[in-house]
Amino acid sequence: MPTVEQNLFLWGKADGWKDDGDKWSEKWGGTELEWSTSIFPRIRQFIPVPTILEIAPGYGRWTQFLKGFCEQLIAVDVSPACVERCKERFAADPHVRCYVNDGKSLAMVEDRSIDFAFSFDSLVHVEADIIAAYLDQLGRKLKPGAFAFLHHSNLGAYSNSIWLPKAIGRQQPIGANGGPQMSRSLWLRRRMLSKLTDWGLVNTFDNRAESMSAKVLREACDAAGLECRAQELVNWNHGRSLIDCFSVVTPAGGQSRRPPRLLENPHLMDEAERARRTAELYHSARSRD
């Protein structure tokens, strides 16, 4: 289960951000293709707006596009190295302001000042307690009628699967010591997976948060005075399992809340592959090589 400290250690080192994080868009054929193919079509209904809040921008992979859709962009990250790089990268853009936080605070953001909040490919590493803290603050920071688009883990929906990460695999069986209730055979299979992970034979979902799911986010929204309007469950690098979720939330109005619209999409990686192959086709048509 990634903690704030673990995430700071994992993502706070400059040598892990070669090419400003563009390596994580390779499946799409590049960052610009990922933005134009898989991100912008999903958020175009919500921008442009006066003020955008980006949570966990890293080295500004999406900030470079978002900044063209607002009069003011506030970027908040737990990593001082990431914030320093964003300040350097967007020094010529005075409407972009960058802040270091403690991994869960939005105290530097004025209440009722945000028209659109955004986070992509970062909060998947954040556990349920931190997501709940962010949502509680977004309930105050978002203007009435504003929206947030949040990319988070849905790994918690697979809590009964043997393919959960090694941290759960090391829990004691039958709920001992506060661990999850599970059969001894399931626990033993989890232990085997843990060993395979230690030996480098299994990739445990890229440090996805184990306690987060689409359902957990909806419950946290209710507690924060927010309404979850839509959720898209997607695969990410690991077959067809819907281990990630894109959620759209907004401050709850006076009327009764409706259940969010749900879409199960096991084809996000196919979307990425098509974008990459199409771009390669037309790039090769232009080149003689």
Where are these regions (language model features)?
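Class I (Rossmann-like) S-adenosyl-L-methionine-dependent methyltransferase catalytic domain
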Residues: 1-49, 59-107, 126-130, 147-289
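Conserved S-adenosyl-L-methionine
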Residues: 56
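A conserved beta-strand element that flanks and buttresses the S-adenosyl-L-methionine
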Residues: 118
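Short catalytic micro-motifs in class I SAM-dependent methyltransferases
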Residues: 121-122
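A short glycine-rich, Lys/Arg-flanked "PGG" loop and its adjoining helix->strand segment in the class I
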Residues: 132-144
